[in-house]
Amino acid sequence: MEVNYNNKKSSKFLTNIIRESDITNKLKVKDNGFKYKAICINTKKKDSLKIGIGNVTLKEKNFILVLENNRNRLYNRYKDLERLLREAIKNNIDLLVLPENYVPYEWLPVLTKFSAKNQIGIITGVEHFITNKNGDIPQAYDDCSRVHNLTAVILPYEDGKGGECNYSYLRLHEKTDLAPGEKQYIEGYGFSEATKNEVELFCWHNVWFPVFCCFELTSIQNRSVFQSYADMLVAIEWNKDVKYFSNIIESLSRDIHCYCIQVNSSNYGDSRIVQPTKADFMNKVRVKGGDNNIILVSSIDIKKLRDYQKKKYELQKDDRCFKPTPPRFDKTIVIKKINNTLQDELLKNEED
């Protein structure tokens, strides 16, 4: 599902700005029942991104209240979100990342309009919600059946004519694999889970990245697909098993050879930005705990990473800013990203 906010332009305008294609065959993935899509937003190229990770606490009681049709929409909860958005503006960040299950579905229009106005990207988990057989969200749960866990990827863009008008693109990703504990609660209350076997690869400011929601990250098959393509990988979580996911995210940064942004509930912690370097410098930022909701900020240097990746091993081992790329890492894809031609290659056949 995708939505464009503040946009009254023609469909031709949208086609020039937002391009989407099924790239499953181009990734040469063995048939695993998943569909892989590339979504490209035509925005000005950036050599680095300033990332803000939200250190916020998720409350299990809010999840239970959803299942009991008694959702928490207290004003204090909205004020917490508002404070984070003000911090994002104050710190002049490019992308704000929040954990799984954080924002109520009804508040997404607030985020998309904020994103468009301030040209700040937002990736956040959407609080569980329940639909009936027609896919509607009713007031009563008499006819309800499925519980949804969505990730919202909100990417802003301008009209391409001097930035006179600002817009934002919203993509809602349905979680592909629910955690066992999550399923236990959902089925225990008499519902079934809604899932969809689709994984997206985004291109925004010529930065390429997939987004994973917590338990999805445990799939070796899906997290390995984007090697050479991903400049960064985003993982939003609500996860108690911090050590297991810590091992995954550290290995992933080296195996895929990209920056990894992991955001978890602050009471479990290990929210961080990881880079493919030696262990001493691996974490650009890392945090756990705290009673106040805050944003931690760090920049990732996309140009520096690509310039390193395009070198052969003999030069990489002498340049110690990163660890060497793994075997079969495709440097031709890196060159295409540097030249900003990768999206044309991935999408051209679909559009022809």
Question: Model-predicted segments: where are they?
Answer:
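N-terminal, active-site-proximal structural segment of metallo-dependent hydrolase catalytic domains
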Residues: 1-95, 102-103
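Cysteine/selenocysteine-centered motifs that mediate thiol-based redox chemistry or coordinate metal-sulfur cofactors
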Residues: 12-22, 201-215, 312-352
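Short, flexible loop segments at the rims of nucleotide/cofactor-binding pockets, characterized by
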Residues: 72-76, 98-102, 186-191, 209-216, ...
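Active-site-proximal beta-strand elements of phosphoester/diester hydrolases
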Residues: 48-70, 172-174, 207-216, 234-236
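CN hydrolase (nitrilase-like) catalytic-core segments centered on the catalytic cysteine
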Residues: 106-127, 135, 144, 208, ...
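Cys-nucleophile CN-hydrolase/nitrilase-fold catalytic domain and related Cys-dependent amidase chemistry
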Residues: 73-171, 239-241, 254-256
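Short, surface-exposed connector motifs at secondary-structure boundaries
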Residues: 90-96, 203-207, 228-233
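Active-site catalytic loop in hydrolytic enzyme cores
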Residues: 13-44, 138-228, 247-248
